[in-house]
Structure formats: C-alpha cells, structure tokens
From Swiss-Prot:
Species, as recorded: Emericella nidulans (strain FGSC A4 / ATCC 38163 / CBS 112.46 / NRRL 194 / M139)
Subunit structure: Monomer.
Domain comment quoted from the record: The CHCH domain contains a conserved twin Cys-X(9)-Cys motif which is required for import and stability of MIA40 in mitochondria.
Cofactor annotation remark: Cu(2+) or Zn(2+).
Name used for this protein in its record: Mitochondrial intermembrane space import and assembly protein 40
Length: 283
C-alpha cells in the first residue's frame, strides 16, 4: 500500500529542465548576432584622438631625425660648361707638385737660417757710418732721448766682445760728434779700437783683413791717379803742360836750378878744378 519514496521518485515523470552551460568561446573574427549602434560621442572621441596623434607626429622633434624613405634618386650637381671633369693627365701634375712641396718647404726653411748666419758674420765688417745708419733705422739710437741701444742686433754683438769698451767709446763718439766732417774728433778712439782688434785676431780677424784691403786700395788709387790724368788728356798741349808741371814740382822739391840758368856738367866742373891757376889764367 505504501511504496518506498525512492521508487516513487524514480517513476515520477521528470519535467524538462534546461541544462546550465557556461559561456562559449568567442573569437575576434566571429561576431555576435546582434550589434549595438555606436553613439556619436564615441565616434567624435575616436576622430579627435586620431587627429591629435597625427598632429603630434608631424610637429614633435622626437620624430624629426628619422630618415625619410624616398625612391627618387638624388639630384647631382650640374657641372659648369667651362669646367670639365678631372682626367688622369690633369691629376698627375698635381700629385708631382704635392710631392715636391715638402722639399721646397725644407729649402725655404734652410735659406732664412743661412741668411741669418751670413748677416751675423758680416755685421762686424761694417763701418761706423753704416752701423749708425742701421742703428737709426732699427731704433738702436734714439735721437729724441740720445740713448743708444747696445743690444740692437744691427751692432752685431761687438759692444759685448773683448773690445766692447773701445767699440762703445768710438761708436758713441761718432754718433754724438758735431765736427765737420763727422767723426774727426774720434780718430784716437777709433785707433784704440783697431789696436784692440789687432790684439785679438782670433775674434776680429775678418775686420783686420777688411781694413788692410781698404788701405791697399786707397794707396793704389793715390799712385794711379796721375797716370789716369795723363791718359785722360786727349790733346798734346795738355799732356805737355801736365808734364811741365810735374817736372817743375820735382825740381822745386829736389832744389835743382831753373831751366833759365846755365847747367854745368859734373865731369867738366871736376876737370876745371884740377887745372892749375896758371892754366886758368892762360885760358
């Protein structure tokens, strides 16, 4: 009469119950069955963000250094009509000149050095007048203050040599001399300087040689001067007058008699003195 509850439940009809299932997987490519239309606000925001990104990309300095890709070849500069492209023949002379340039520079550097050495060696050989002229030009002597710069290179260092004191005395005397001709009152000081030069031939040998050559030339000029005057006389009358003047000078210097007086030979004078007084009276 009473059935068990378990059997009653099993035999009882079960109503259709929907099975609860989880959410199915959905891919990006798959779309839902129903899509909602976007609002105008959402579209406006999207357009504003896109335009802002483009503006920032074009105006910002972050992307300024990025190279731009271009498929067009770069335009090459056009050569002028008067200029031609370099050739092998035109390049060879330039390469040779570039090779010769270092040698020429070395020669040019050696030439001033040799010139300076020659100038230093020739500086002691200059006369006092030349030294004074160079001193005026190179500011060794200041006429306004009356001071002499003994360190001037134009003096050749002679103011500090073994005969430096004598050279200073002679040079300063010549510079300050007011006699005519200039330097006549400084002869003694120049002689003292030359004596000092002779005492040091190892230092002033070149100066002594120049002095001897100058003296020899002066003596030769003095001896040859009458001969040159005789040669220059083109008229026989002038030659005769010059010869007569020379003869008169020689006679006056030797104390001889003039041409108007009688000239007695020496042998005749001796023979007359040997004669006896009787022979002289007979004559």
């Amino acid at each position: 009469m009473f059935r068990p509850a378990s059997r009653a439940l099993l035999r009882a009809p079960t109503p259709a119950v929907g099975v609860a299932r989880g959410p199915t997987r959905r891919f990006i490519s798959s779309s839902t069955g129903s899509t909602k239309p976007r609002s105008w606000k959402n579209t406006f925001i999207r357009v504003g963000l896109a335009s802002g990104a483009v503006y920032y990309y074009n105006t910002s300095s972050v992307f300024a250094e990025t190279p731009s890709l271009s498929f067009r070849p770069e335009a090459q500069p056009k050569h002028e009509d008067g200029k031609s492209l370099p050739t092998l023949d035109s390049i060879k002379p330039k390469s040779r000149e570039e090779k010769k340039a270092p040698a020429a520079a070395a020669d040019a550097a050696a030439t001033p050095a040799s010139t300076g050495a020659n100038a230093q060696s020739e500086s002691p050989l200059k006369s006092a007048e030349e030294l004074e002229a160079e001193a005026d030009q190179q500011a060794a002597f200041n006429p306004e203050t009356g001071e002499i710069n003994w360190d001037c290179p134009c003096l050749g260092g002679m103011a500090y040599g073994p005969c430096g004191e004598e050279f200073r005395a002679a040079f300063s005397c010549f510079v300050y001399s007011e006699e005519e001709p200039k330097g006549m009152d400084c002869i003694d000081k120049f002689k003292a300087m030359q004596d000092c030069f002779r005492a040091h031939p190892d230092v002033y040998g070149a100066e002594l040689d120049d002095d001897e050559e100058a003296g020899a030339e002066a003596n030769a000029a003095g001896v040859e001067q009458p001969l040159a005057a005789e040669v220059d006389a083109s008229v026989p009358v002038e030659k005769h007058e010059q010869a007569k003047e020379v003869r008169d000078e020689v006679k006056s210097a030797a104390g001889e008699v003039a041409e108007s007086e009688e000239v007695v030979p020496k042998a005749l004078d001796v023979s007359e003195q040997e004669k006896t007084p009787e022979q002289q009276t007979e004559k």
